[in-house]
């Protein structure tokens, strides 16, 4: 019951950090302001002169003892932060810890004000207050938070941590409060003051830990996470390990029961002391804190503001306070600047801006193994990048690529060793004025929080490695070299590295190291990036034996006006001018009033192959399936495998005693190959139950037909069947497309129809539909191989209008195979491209609407590309545009002016060829300007 309450409370605080922080600070300010403006009626030393005996008692405090107490309090606080440092980034945890201490002190002061007590005795009670602060539980809760990989997991893990830690902390707080409260009955005034402040600070600390700290921790981690994809920079490890560690530290049930008994006994003691013996024992009152003798006090006029009076009392400029401040400054500086090397000598190398830091205790040999990768230009434009100073193959969770630099970097190009590594990164954006060598060796600042965590030493023996892997601390305690040894000895399958290491990025890095040693050129993978990618979406879904990811440029064509709605269409391609040409077609069709589309068919297919003893039996089964009642029975079995699968038809064909069945079904917003395969398998089992002689030879008999040129897809359709049409007025054809409707119609007939027929084409009656289909497929995470059938397209053109100057064109695409859920659509970049067109995931208004809309967009974009390319061919601009804008080298010399251009200058005495040359030239790769 308590765990559930703390779970809900932790989830609320961590999911609403701003609200909790603002409410806590507002409550603190309100409590402080209650008595700050009104003031206490009697404040010793400010508006009243205390009795002589009180002053004497105050002045007789042992300064040496208090100085020792303050020193111990500062040292204890430093040790608490050092413990907290072991869980992760010292800056994140330091900020959270400082927030906690500051807020606890501030809130304690507010509580003291709320109870009507003054703060003049808090300066001596401050060390006691600091000694009561225990950051162990804060460290435990922080470990729960740092084991998260996303911000949503941060909220969940903080809530789980609160559910585990909350009951224990509550019990400890109650018992400690009751124990300290015994001191309030000691009749020793100084002890009563200390215990009073201690009780109030415990209550304040408990409130802050339960509310302010979870909210602050959640907010700090959210603000510090600069990686949109991939693991956050503060990611610590597996949640299960943190949970297991906390379970190991769980208090003994016997101790918990003893605490409960102590709590009950202490409550009875206090009840007896305060309630039953009230006549013999004085209650704790204000007189304990400012003055108990009302008759001997003398009222005086304040000589300073109340806040200044409290400040001088809390921190007077005396020698013991100055020594305490110096000690606190030294320890804080040591914690911030030297704690890495002093506390963890195994972290020999730190990542800094252009400097190399080596542990002084390391010998020359170890230091010589540290590589320094150059720095980028120091210009302000490169301030957002940091340089990885050193990388070795001994990193635990952040291993780099085992590829050596090229000879131009003054490093050996010999085969890879375990101590020569170089990170591979894919960086987008300008790199300032640095040289090319420097540009290749820099990465963004948020990508480098990497330090070495192990000594540079030889791998341990194989038996010890197996014990660590199977029984000990697990793969996290192994270096990359040791993991490679286990892979080479077949103890770890290479394809399971991500799962066994429980760190996908490290698994990919280790696999790259293994593969690099097998390549003829060891640094072949240097330019293939792998870091800062969320492989959790890849494993078991999109790719196996991953060694990186392939960045492909993504352009946008649009706005595409389709059925009254505008779309920006993403296209991933390396073919120059493709996006620009498609963009020009979109502009022309938008000016013409847009494109209209119609979905004429929908259904993914799977065509299994079965064999029967004779053709006669095969024919009988074919006729049996044509009976509606029998088809309904198979349909019911088929649809039992998925709530989205809806079987539409079963088409059969015989080849002797072999029977091919083509199951066609709706698959919702998924492309549906896996879905329909499961349904087909169950349908075949049902058919086999009724006809035992059926022998299922293959779930796919190429009668589908998938990823192969086939007339059946062109005729019967597969996936989505879409037709798009538009009418382009004559003035747009002439002004935008630079041609005429009659020329386009004539070219389309002889090129797309006659030419394709002469080539024996099946579904290829178009100019370049596959270009657009493939570019959109790669951008949106579709199966790129399915462009074979999806690119089936017939482009038709006709003249329209009174004078035949308008152009009517249509594109018919009967087999667009795509989906908006599953497969590569789950990858974050591809998902973003789907989101651009508002077709990401399943449609909440109807199953399959998003996939159908995407198919319409594909067909409409194909039509825009067809119109632009055909216009370029008709006008004779194709070769010229590609020679200018689709070459990797510098542009060839610009051609001489055309006859038409010369004619416009006939009235001039001379022709300015240089001006014409400048107007026709363009920078490399800027075909968008001319095509838009």
From Swiss-Prot:
Residues 357-442 are annotated as: Disordered. SUPFAM superfamilies: Multidrug efflux transporter AcrB transmembrane domain, NAD-binding domain of HMG-CoA reductase, Substrate-binding domain of HMG-CoA reductase. The keyword DNA-binding does not apply. GO terms for biological process: cholesterol biosynthetic process; coenzyme A metabolic process; isoprenoid biosynthetic process; sterol biosynthetic process. It comes from Strongylocentrotus purpuratus (Purple sea urchin). It is a multi-pass membrane protein. Residues 374-403 have a biased composition (Polar residues). The keyword Signal does not apply. Keywords: Cholesterol biosynthesis, Cholesterol metabolism, Endoplasmic reticulum, Glycoprotein, Lipid biosynthesis, Lipid metabolism, Membrane, NADP, Oxidoreductase, Phosphoprotein, Steroid biosynthesis, Steroid metabolism, Sterol biosynthesis, Sterol metabolism, Transmembrane, Transmembrane helix. GO terms for molecular function: hydroxymethylglutaryl-CoA reductase (NADPH) activity; NADP binding. Belongs to the HMG-CoA reductase family. Pathway: Metabolic intermediate biosynthesis; (R)-mevalonate biosynthesis; (R)-mevalonate from acetyl-CoA: step 3/3. It catalyses: (R)-mevalonate + 2 NADP(+) + CoA = (3S)-3-hydroxy-3-methylglutaryl-CoA + 2 NADPH + 2 H(+). The modification Phosphoserine is found at residue 888. InterPro entries: HMG_CoA_Rdtase (IPR002202), HMG_CoA_Rdtase_cat_sf (IPR023074), HMG_CoA_Rdtase_CS (IPR023076), HMG_CoA_Rdtase_eu_arc (IPR004554), HMG_CoA_Rdtase_metazoan (IPR004816), HMG_CoA_Rdtase_N (IPR023282), HMG_CoA_Rdtase_NAD(P)-bd_sf (IPR009023), HMG_CoA_Rdtase_sub-bd_dom_sf (IPR009029). NCBIfam families: 2A060605, HMG_CoA_R_NADP. Glycans are attached at residues 279, 850, 886. The chain crosses the membrane at residues 20-40, 59-79, 92-112, 113-133, 162-182, 193-213, 322-342. Residues 468-932 are annotated as: Catalytic. It is found in: Endoplasmic reticulum membrane. It holds the Pfam family HMG-CoA_red. This is 3-hydroxy-3-methylglutaryl-coenzyme A reductase.
């Amino acid at each position: 019951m308590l765990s559930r309450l703390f779970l809900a409370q932790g989830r609320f605080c961590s999911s609403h950090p701003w609200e909790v922080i603002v409410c806590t600070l507002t409550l603190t300010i309100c409590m402080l302001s209650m008595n700050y403006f009104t003031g206490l009626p009697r404040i010793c030393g400010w508006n009243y002169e205390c009795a002589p005996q009180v002053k004497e008692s105050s002045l007789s405090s042992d300064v040496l003892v208090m100085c020792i107490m303050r020193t111990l309090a500062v040292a204890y606080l430093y040790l608490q932060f050092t413990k907290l440092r072991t869980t992760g980034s010292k800056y994140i945890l330091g900020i959270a810890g400082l927030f906690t201490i500051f807020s606890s002190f501030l809130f304690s002061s507010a509580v003291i004000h709320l109870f009507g007590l003054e703060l003049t005795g808090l300066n001596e009670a401050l060390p006691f207050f600091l000694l009561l602060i225990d950051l162990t539980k804060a460290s435990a809760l922080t470990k729960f938070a740092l084991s998260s990989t996303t911000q949503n997991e941060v909220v969940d893990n903080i809530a789980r941590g609160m559910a585990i830690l909350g009951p224990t902390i509550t019990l400890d707080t109650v018992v400690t409060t009751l124990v300290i409260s015994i001191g309030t009955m000691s009749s020793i005034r100084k002890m009563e003051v200390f215990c009073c402040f201690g009780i109030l600070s415990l209550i304040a600390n408990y409130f802050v830990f339960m509310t302010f700290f979870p909210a602050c921790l959640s907010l700090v981690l959210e603000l510090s996470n600069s990686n949109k994809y991939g693991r956050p920079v503060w990611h610590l490890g597996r949640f299960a390990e943190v949970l297991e560690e906390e379970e190991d530290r769980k208090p003994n049930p016997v101790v918990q029961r003893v605490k409960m008994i102590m709590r009950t006994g202490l409550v009875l003691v206090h009840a007896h002391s305060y309630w039953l013996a009230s006549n013999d024992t004085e209650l704790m009152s204000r007189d304990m804190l400012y003055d108990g003798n009302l008759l001997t006090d003398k009222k005086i006029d304040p000589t300073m503001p109340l806040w200044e009076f409290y400040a001088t009392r809390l921190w007077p400029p005396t020698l013991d306070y100055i020594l305490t401040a110096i000690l606190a400054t030294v320890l804080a500086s040591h914690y911030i600047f030297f704690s890495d090397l002093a506390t963890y000598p195994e972290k020999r190398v730190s990542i800094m801006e252009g400097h190399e830091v080596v542990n002084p205790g390391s010998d020359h040999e170890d230091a010589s193994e540290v590589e320094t990768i150059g720095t980028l230009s120091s210009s302000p434009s490169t301030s957002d990048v940091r340089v990885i100073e050193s990388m070795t193959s001994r990193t635990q969770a952040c291993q780099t690529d085992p590829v050596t630099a090229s000879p131009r970097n003054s490093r050996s190009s010999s085969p890879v060793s375990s101590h020569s590594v170089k990170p591979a990164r894919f960086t987008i954006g300008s790199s300032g004025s640095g040289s090319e060598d420097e540009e290749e060796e820099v990465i963004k600042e948020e990508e480098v929080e990497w330090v070495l965590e192990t000594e540079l030493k030889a791998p341990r023996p194989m038996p010890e490695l197996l014990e660590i892997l199977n029984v000990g601390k697990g793969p996290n305690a192994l270096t990359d070299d040791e993991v490679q040894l286990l892979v080479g000895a077949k103890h770890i399958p290479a394809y399971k590295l991500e799962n066994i290491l429980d760190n996908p990025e490290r698994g990919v890095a280790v696999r790259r190291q293994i593969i690099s040693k097998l390549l003829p050129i060891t640094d072949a993978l240097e330019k293939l990036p792998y870091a800062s990618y969320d492989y959790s979406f890849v494993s078991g879904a999109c790719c196996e034996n991953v060694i990186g990811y392939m960045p492909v440029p993504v352009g946008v064509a649009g706005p595409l006006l389709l059925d009254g709605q505008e779309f920006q269409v993403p296209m991933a391609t390396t073919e120059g001018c493709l996006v620009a040409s498609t963009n020009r077609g979109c502009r022309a069709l938008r000016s013409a009033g847009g494109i209209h589309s119609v979905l004429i068919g929908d259904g993914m297919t799977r065509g299994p192959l079965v064999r029967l003893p004779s053709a006669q039996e095969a024919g009988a089964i074919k006729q049996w399936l044509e009976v509606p009642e029998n088809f309904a029975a198979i349909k019911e079995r088929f649809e039992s495998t998925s709530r989205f699968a809806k079987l539409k038809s079963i088409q059969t064909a015989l080849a002797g005693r072999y029977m091919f069945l083509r199951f066609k079904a709706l698959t919702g917003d998924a492309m549906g190959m896996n879905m329909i395969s499961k349904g087909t398998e169950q349908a075949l089992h049902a058919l086999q139950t009724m006809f035992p002689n059926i022998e299922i030879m293959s779930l796919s008999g190429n009668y589908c037909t998938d990823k192969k040129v086939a007339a059946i897809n062109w005729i019967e359709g597969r996936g989505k069947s879409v037709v798009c049409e538009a009418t382009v007025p004559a003035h747009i054809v002439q002004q935008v497309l630079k041609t005429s409707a009659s020329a386009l119609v004539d070219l389309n007939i002889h090129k797309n129809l006659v030419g394709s027929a002469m080539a024996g084409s099946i579904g290829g009656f178009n100019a370049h539909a596959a270009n657009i289909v493939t570019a959109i497929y790669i951008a949106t995470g579709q199966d790129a191989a399915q462009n074979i059938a999806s690119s089936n397209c017939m482009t038709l053109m006709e003249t329209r209008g009174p004078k035949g100057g308008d152009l009517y064109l249509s594109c018919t695409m009967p087999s667009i195979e795509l989906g908006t859920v599953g497969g590569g659509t789950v990858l974050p970049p591809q998902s973003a491209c789907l989101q651009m067109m508002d077709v990401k995931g399943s449609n909440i208004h109807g199953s399959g609407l998003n996939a159908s809309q995407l198919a319409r967009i594909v067909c409409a974009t194909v039509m825009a590309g067809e119109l632009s390319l055909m216009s370029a061919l008709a006008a004779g601009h194709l070769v010229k545009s590609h020679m200018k804008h689709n070459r990797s080298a510098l542009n060839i010399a610009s051609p001489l002016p055309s006859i038409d251009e010369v004619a416009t200058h006939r009235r001039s005495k001379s022709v300015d060829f240089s001006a014409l040359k400048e107007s026709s030239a363009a920078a490399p790769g800027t075909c968008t300007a001319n095509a838009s």
